[in-house]
Amino acid sequence: MTPAQSQARAQLSDGRYVYCVVDTTSVPSASVGETTGIDDETVRVVSVDGVGAVVHDCTSVYDADDIDQVKRWLVTHQQVVDDVSDVFGTPLPMRFDTVFAGGDSALTDWLADTHPRLRTELDGFAGCWEYRVTLLWDPQPFEAHVTATDDTLQALEARQAEADAGTTFLLEKQYDARLAERRRARRSALASDLSAAVEPVATQVASQDTTTSLRDESVSERHTPIARLAVLAPETDESALGSQLDDIAARDGVTIRFTGPWPPYTFAPDICTDEPNQA
Amino acid sequence: MNPTKRNSHAIVEFVDVLLRDGAVIQADAIVTVAGVPLLGISLRAAIAGMTTMTEYGIFDGWDADHRRRNAQP
């Protein structure tokens, strides 16, 4: 922790850790149930006119050198969001470690100031969830097929058999380049097909970097992630989305990872108090 | 196919997402240091090997909870 962060921790006396914002119009705020928050803190809802922030009281932000501790916080955070989602429906999720200073009064001031914007966002996300789709590809079956059927590759191979050493070297380079070109085209086609498959059932789609910041030991060496999509879709279309993905997953060398339903983390907007209301 | 939330890759996914995404609030009352979110890139980079989380039993309660939900009609 930096000295500045240490100072911030020391100064926070009446903090509110915010998990998410929920629609409390039809469900009383007190219905948050028995879910317990990070470090077993009591979770409650601070509500202003049908828009509620799911919070626990805290006296510090959450940062630690102990990685296992951070992992527990993250899982608990998600657990709370899952639990309140069951009660209130799709939440507007906050990024981990969103902490207000100034107690309930600061929080209710913020809820009142941003109320039209929060209302619009909650209404927009109602009934929808985020699903995440990763297309992993093992190129070996494709390469086996292409080397047996591509005319250019076949011709290069035949010429290599009759060429001298210098020419063979150049022909091998051409062979590799042609194979790489076919592989690139296939990757591009698979990524396009995936986008086309999810598009009919998606409210929004965001294409994302295929590398995560975290190491995923469950990915085999041979499988390369070639497309990663965050898909916002109505809960009622979850099966349809799964069916669309079945078609892509049936292709040679393709593995589809389909996770969710998540709160709309990717599609949640940044909320600035000073911006014009969008209601 | 049906989506999952319990496999190791789903866990990697949500931790990655949770640290990177979600609504960011910009308001005077939000605790930051010089406008910079307190939990930054360095922490994300430090969290590796998420599948080992199951070894610590961190997910036991969560797993059970989701199995129960999935079993409901």
Curated annotation (Swiss-Prot), chain A:
**Would I find Ion transport among this entry's keywords?**
no
Q: Name one GO cellular component term.
A: gas vesicle
Keyword annotations of the record: Gas vesicle, Plasmid
Give its localization.
Gas vesicle
> What domain of life does the native source organism fall in?
Archaea
The secretion signal range is: none
Pfam families registered for this protein in UniProt = GvpL_GvpF
Q: What induces it?
A: In PHH4 (a deletion of the p-vac locus) transcribed in all growth phases, maximal expression in mid-stationary phase. An unstable 6kb transcript able to cover gvpD-gvpE-gvpF-gvpG-gvpH-gvpI-gvpJ-gvpK-gvpL-gvpM is detected, as well as smaller transcripts. Gas vesicles appear earlier when grown in static culture, possibly due to O(2)-limitation.
Task: Supply one GO BP term.
Answer: gas vesicle organization
Please describe the quaternary structure of this protein.
Answer: GvpF to GvpM interact with each other in vitro, and may form multi-subunit complex(es). Interacts with GvpC, GvpN and GvpO.
Question: Which family is this protein grouped under?
Answer: Belongs to the gas vesicle GvpF/GvpL family.
Function (record text): Proteins GvpF to GvpM might be involved in nucleating gas vesicle formation. A minor component of the gas vesicle. Gas vesicles are hollow, gas filled proteinaceous nanostructures found in several microbial planktonic microorganisms. They allow positioning of halobacteria at the optimal depth for growth in the poorly aerated, shallow brine pools of their habitat.
What more is known?
Encoded in a 14-gene locus called c-vac which produces cylindrical gas vesicles only in the stationary growth phase.
Q: Which NCBIfam families match?
A: gas_vesic_GvpL
This chain belongs to which protein, by name? Gas vesicle protein L2
Q: Which organism is it from?
A: Halobacterium salinarum (strain ATCC 700922 / JCM 11081 / NRC-1) (Halobacterium halobium)
The gene behind this protein is gvpL2
Curated annotation (Swiss-Prot), chain B:
Is Transport one of the keywords UniProt gives this record? no
Keyword list (alphabetical) reads: Gas vesicle, Plasmid
InterPro entries in the record: Gas-vesicle_GvpA-like, GvpA, GvpA-like_CS
UniProt cross-references to Pfam families, sorted A to Z: Gas_vesicle (PF00741)
Task: Cite the PROSITE patterns for this sequence.
Answer: GAS_VESICLE_A_1, GAS_VESICLE_A_2
- Description of what induces expression: In PHH4 (a deletion of the p-vac locus) transcribed in all growth phases, maximal expression in mid-stationary phase. An unstable 6kb transcript able to cover gvpD-gvpE-gvpF-gvpG-gvpH-gvpI-gvpJ-gvpK-gvpL-gvpM is detected, as well as smaller transcripts. Gas vesicles appear earlier when grown in static culture, possibly due to O(2)-limitation.
Compartments where found? Gas vesicle
The molecular function GO annotations come to: structural molecule activity
Give the main location. Answer: other
* Cellular component terms (Gene Ontology): gas vesicle; vesicle membrane
Additional note from the record: Encoded in a 14-gene locus called c-vac which produces cylindrical gas vesicles only in the stationary growth phase.
Family as reported in the entry's similarity comment = Belongs to the gas vesicle GvpA family.
Q: What does this protein do?
A: Proteins GvpF to GvpM might be involved in nucleating gas vesicle formation. A minor component of the gas vesicle. Gas vesicles are hollow, gas filled proteinaceous nanostructures found in several microbial planktonic microorganisms. They allow positioning of halobacteria at the optimal depth for growth in the poorly aerated, shallow brine pools of their habitat. Expression of 2 c-vac DNA fragments containing 2 divergently transcribed regions (gvpE-gvpF-gvpG-gvpH-gvpI-gvpJ-gvpK-gvpL-gvpM and gvpA-gvpC-gvpN-gvpO) allows H.volcanii to produce gas vesicles.
Subunit annotation: GvpF to GvpM interact with each other in vitro, and may form multi-subunit complex(es). Might interact with GvpA.
Task: State the protein's name.
Answer: Gas vesicle protein M2
